[in-house]
Amino acid sequence: MGRRGRGGGGGMGGGINRRYLSQVMDTCGKDLSTAEDIVDDLRSRYGNFARLTRQVLLLNVRQVLNVRNNKRVKDEDEDDNIGDEEGSASQRKKQRRVDEKEEKLQRAEQSHLRKRNMERSVSSSPSSSSSSEDSGDVSTSEDAVYGEKLSPPRFDLINDSLRDNYAKLNSSSKKPIGSPAEKNVEVETVSNKGRSKLATMGARKEAKVSLSLSGATGNGDLEVEGTKGPTFKDFGGIKKILDELEMNVLFPILNPEPFKKIGVKPPSGILFHGPPGCGKTKLANAIANEAGVPFYKISATEVISGVSGASEENIRELFSKAYRTAPSIVFIDEIDAIGSKRENQQREMEKRIVTQLLTCMDGPGNKGDKNAPDSSAGFVLVIGATNRPDALDPALRRSGRFETEIALTAPDEDARAEILSVVAQKLRLEGPFDKKRIARLTPGFVGADLESVAYLAGRKAIKRILDSRKSEQSGDGEDDKSWLRMPWPEEELEKLFVKMSDFEEAVNLVQASLTREGFSIVPDVKWDDVGGLDHLRLQFNRYIVRPIKKPDIYKAFGVDLETGFLLYGPPGCGKTLIAKAAANEAGANFMHIKGAELLNKYVGESELAIRTLFQRARTCAPCVIFFDEVDALTTSRGKEGAWVVERLLNQFLVELDGGERRNVYVIGATNRPDVVDPAFLRPGRFGNLLYVPLPNADERASILKAIARKKPIDPSVDLDGIAKNNCEGFSGADLAHLVQKATFQAVEEMIGSSESSEDDVTDITQCTIKTRHFEQALSLVSPSVNKQQRRHYDALSTKLQESVGRNTEQVTIGPSFTLE
């Protein structure tokens, strides 16, 4: 048994020798017809087989039976063919020679077709096609293959279906993608799991065609259909950008002759950058539709592959198709995914992808390479889109690649009004549409947000009709959802209109995109809510509001008013309120930074936060940045503890320089101007120092009335008398606290009287704040700024005026105050 594994016939699973098993199976009875019966018999008679598992033994028995059956069938076939072989020996020799010759011909044909298909797929020049290819005739004879005439085989043994496949393959390789009449087309190739869609419309052909072609990243279906998509007329608020694109992009594509004549190279790349939702992708599609050239659209993440080298090959394939169909446009969305800075990349594959992208953008390759596409037919315009332009590799942003950068910033109030005009064209409006009002209610909204507002306004209009249908439904209670299935008669459809109120409600349902980018919602604080302060209002109108609303006039005179304001004074005087009112009046984007929220414990992160803050503000200019409690970031250098913010302070000074601001207006507020570094107080940074003192008697009365405007004040209450006679030294915050305490006293009194009475019903209309409630509140509230602090701030204002010698004039009319 130990030598069984070396027996003839080869070993099998379980240590069983095939020859031995076959001999043992011969001893079984003839009545055992199945493998299962043979296994049971062997296990019952032989102990070594009983020790094996039934499954292993059954597998080996079946293999032996299969070998026997195959041998039997082969022997029968040989017996049947003995006579035929003896009678046709010479014929078989001749047949063999014919088969060898035909096989050689087939291999040569296949090699020839593969070579020709490869040449057709690489070459884009019309001259590369022969006259026979232009006519659609394809030669597959041995003359075309070998260059000499060969005698045909005696018997044509090649499969007819195989010949048909060869002919179809060759004819499809000769078939051009589009005729010259259809060359002015838009082609959209969208790579999605190896599938590519190519949208094409000929100049004279409107019928839809479907064919198969390899896509940008692999083989896929190619759909050719009519051009559909956005155009330049679908945009609002970016007229200057559209004019620039028409001159620098569309004109070179549609009229290349002037550029060739004068020897000027057309633009090779455009980089769109801006916050999400501002229309970067839509604008790229509009360029392709306006130009009418092949358009290859791909997301950057679709290029990346897990196989080494496949990502680079996908990029080469994409640009190869673009250069073969030049002039064409390649659009790479979210290009920062494959074009990030190489020094920050951790993996070599990511660095190779960036390098391959740089190489492909430089041109179609080596002109000496016969397989390289010919770029003489035109050029390829590469468009990239990203909301992180600083993350791109610097080599991508040099001349010859993305040489033109267009910032699609968040729209201002006038631009939002133009966008709303475009969006409202598709809506069925009732009555006049006040686009200026909606634009004023939507600070920080981008184009996508305004489209969402229009969509939600339409839903509000439909819901209004649905609510009326619900109320008119019969109250039988059988089916309370029958209104969902009720048909819409024509008279009810005619009632569907979008009203102005629908837009106003929809605005509150959409979150501004800029709030996700670090911007703040522009506060709903108007100058009417800030009584007095005529001097401050004049300053803000002169240096912030008017330059934002009428920039052309200031630019014509060469006036540079990009200066900063530093509001200082006792706490609670309304410095923050004034800044919010100025931002609201200007209608610009608004960023509210609260003190030390930019500080970070990690080295370099605080400076990065400052750079990012101003970069976002410049991207979405005009923008107002308000630094509340700015003294936390501007502590004088050299003092104790100043080293914590020293690096941040230096970066802050650089960003505040007028040359770097570019329509970014800065307002700071502090109650400790003495600790601010003097470098911040020079012109061009916080150039205007405005002192906001405590209000006088008349101003206190104005503030108290503004605060009590939304409170149920009893008509018998003398607010003027309370403010002038009982609130000496009160700041705006103290007066707001006083009204709150009086309101709380009135509420407590009303609740106590309702609990003590037998009748639980309370008349809400009789709930008012009376004089006794204010008297009770006055006993609980005291001024937050004492006389010594007032003298300190007055002396500090005089000192700053003498040391700086600029606009530090004390405001003689104190601020009004209102609840936010």
Swiss-Prot record:
Residues 85-122 form a coiled coil. GO terms for biological process: cell division; protein transport. GO terms for cellular component: cytoskeleton; nucleus; phragmoplast. It is found in: Nucleus; Cytoplasm, Cytoskeleton, Phragmoplast. Its main location: nucleus. Residues 121-142 have a biased composition (Low complexity). Residues 72-157, 169-188 are annotated as: Disordered. PROSITE patterns: AAA. The keyword Transport applies. Keywords: ATP-binding, Cell cycle, Cell division, Coiled coil, Cytoplasm, Cytoskeleton, Nucleotide-binding, Nucleus, Protein transport, Repeat, Transport. Disulfide bonds: none annotated. Residues 97-119 have a biased composition (Basic and acidic residues). ATP binds at residues 274-281, 569-576. InterPro entries: AAA+_ATPase, AAA_lid_3, ATPase_AAA_core, ATPase_AAA_CS, CDC48c, P-loop_NTPase. Residues 76-87 have a biased composition (Acidic residues). Belongs to the AAA ATPase family. Probably functions in cell division and growth processes. Interacts with certain SNAREs as part of specialized membrane fusion events where vesicles from the same organelle fuse (homotypic fusion). This is Cell division control protein 48 homolog C. It comes from Arabidopsis thaliana (Mouse-ear cress). The lineage of its organism: Eukaryota, Viridiplantae, Streptophyta, Embryophyta, Tracheophyta.
